[in-house]
Amino acid sequence: MKKALFALFMMVSIAMLAACGNSQGSGSKSKDGDLWASVKKKGVLTVGTEGTYEPFTFHDKKSDKLTGYDVEVIQEVAKRLGLKADFKETQWDSMFAGLNAKRFDVVANQVGKTGRENQYDFSDKYTTSNAVVVTKKDSTIAKEADVKGKTAAQSLTSNYNKLAKEAGAKIEGVEGMAQSLQLIQQGRADLTYNDKLAVLNYLKTSGNKNVKIAFEAGQPQQTYFAFRKGSGELVTHVNKALKEMKEDGTLSKIAKKWFGEDVSK
């Protein structure tokens, strides 16, 4: 009798645990679906971006309008999803805190995912570039080994900061590339790691002859749109739009407009 009651108790317990597991699973799916449903209902995709990182996300000097490669790509994605992109400009080192706090649904700001895979969801890649090291024009820094012990001006939460640390540099925290280059010219930093496309654009548009690209560093860098964990259905729709843009040539067209070549591959 006792054995029969014990067996019955165990069967009921297992059934209850299974029900709880199913409930949690459907709740997780509901959470994903709720975010997409909420975004779709509002008709707005809220986007976190710097607005100071030319040519990816910055303000046009004449119109003061927010523009750039990342801005145009996410605007086109939103358009294809029947949404309007609403940009919330945020300093880079506060970007992921803002995403976590639900100030925006997605980050469009040349985000690398190395070291962040467990904390965030990511879209498919939409840019491939290289990291470069920038120094003063007369600097003797010419290779990775020369970086050790030197001062690198870096945004503390960027992947470029990680590259500088791995090379043995001392880190001087900054808010973005513009401040990094300023510190180099002032002699307060020796170098900075940053995106090759951004640096080439800066050298081309600024006319600044006081700094140079010393060398390329690390492996090619891919960039992605970043989302909070559990944004699955929204990520799926964004990836669908990106896939369409790659297939019909729109993404390549936007890339060539900004860089003269297709950097989306």
Name each model-derived stretch:
Residues 43-49, 144-157:
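Short loop->beta-strand "edge-of-pocket" segments that line small-molecule binding or catalytic clefts
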Residues 28-109:
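Extracytoplasmic small-molecule ligand-binding "clamshell" domains
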